[in-house]
UniProtKB/Swiss-Prot annotation:
Belongs to the peptidase M17 family. Mn(2+) 2 binds at residues 269, 274, 292, 353. Transmembrane segments: none annotated. The lineage of its organism: Bacteria, Pseudomonadati, Pseudomonadota, Gammaproteobacteria, Vibrionales. Its cofactor is Mn(2+). The gene is pepA. It comes from Aliivibrio fischeri (strain ATCC 700601 / ES114). It catalyses: Release of an N-terminal amino acid, Xaa-|-Yaa-, in which Xaa is preferably Leu, but may be other amino acids including Pro although not Arg or Lys, and Yaa may be Pro. Amino acid amides and methyl esters are also readily hydrolyzed, but rates on arylamides are exceedingly low; Release of an N-terminal amino acid, preferentially leucine, but not glutamic or aspartic acids. This is Probable cytosol aminopeptidase. It is found in: Cytoplasm. GO terms for cellular component: cytoplasm. Mn(2+) 1 binds at residues 274, 351, 353. It comes from the Bacteria.
Amino acid sequence: MEFSVKSGSPEKQRSACIVVGVFEPRRLSPIAEQLDKISGGYISSLLRRGDLEGKPGQMLLLHQVPNILSERVLLVGCGKERELGERQYKDIIKKTISTLNETGSMEAVCFLTELHVKGRDTYWKVRQAVESTKDSLYTFNQFKSNKPETRRPLRKLVFNVPTRRELNLGEKAIAHGLSIASGVKASKDLGNMPPNVANPAYLASQARRLADDYETVTTKIIGEEEMKKLGMTSYLAVGQGSHNESMMSIMEYKGHPDPAAKPIVLIGKGLTFDSGGISIKPSEGMDEMKYDMCGAASVFGAMKALAKLNLPLNVVGVLAGCENMPSSNSYRPGDILTTMSGQTVEVLNTDAEGRLVLCDALTYVERYEPECVVDVATLTGACVVALGHHISGLISNHNPLAHELINASEQSGDRAWRLPMAEEYNEQLSSPFADMGNIGGKAAGTITAGCFLSRFAKKYHWAHIDSAGTAWVSGANKGSTGRPVSLLVQFLLNRSGQENEE
């Protein structure tokens, strides 16, 4: 699909469709007023008859409006003008795209990017419109024998910006939005793949393909034999019940003018299926445990977006892939594992496996002497209890890094909330037989999981994002969300100084 920006008055647009906003109660936006004036009051007369109230998401498609060059005009309900916020704006864009796609408008000029959204500029509105459009059009039907096809799909979308001075900003927003949307799609595709396809070897193949596609990326795969030599006993223990080999995929992106510049490291938990192991999960909803690799999927998506953007950074992306299955070879509650760091862990629950994989990955990346490390994991059900399905959890040992990530989450709309990591929580991890247990009881489960990981991240600035509540949705529209790719890429854009430069 093709995106572009232009600056011009609506009456001069010759397109299949012009998209303009209508506010409650039946009040035309400034652009819609211009069209109404040219049409001799045709649009306002329809509103007076009650054809459209202006409620958020309402749509009214008009054909052959008098004196308008375009074939159609789509009126989009935007709610009350002063209450148009970020979430409502993105929802309106998605509904608009669905309507255009269903009605056979193969091209459109969209004036919704001129609407006032509280606290947001043209760059944000155009970029979010691109990301929301791609999100709205996303499908995952690789395994369906009959694939539905849109007869006349939307192929070209032009966003109008208020002034010619903002054209460069709009083009930058489109470039950023397309790169991020590409990363989100890659993350969604990985997450939605069934676990009989997307095993650790499949993750590794995707990492290799990224290196084939971009000369700035090199990929290395660490299998079980090398893990044994490295002393990654904890990581290996989690996967030893599965016939699928554990594999850690390491993608190195070098875009910094100084190749020796310290890298930012992103680590993703890649449990391609998590049965819980010997501490087996309930059968209801277990199919969704294919999404336990969404942390790795989001890191992969962020690396793809990074390569597309060609940012002047050095970044290492780690996909910590393995599978947690019950068998006679599985690790057990009561086992004591010696981690790569030398610290010992008593296994109290084999379903708290993500931290046992991540702890060795966190130790492994010390060799890069990183500028900072961010790990992403669908780690705890406790995070869903604490924050629900809208906001990811964030824990960090470095205040400035935490603030950077929270700021990036607000900028991108992919929100995170910082949780405390006070010393007292560490007491819940104590074990009479090892340096620590792998769980800290029912209370503050997200925080104690973060405290566990922090013990392996003492040599660098570190943050942990728990996306257990945000990485996928359940129900009729079940599927991966691609989060927190947008947050991660915004963080990298900010680090590179290219967040919204004109």
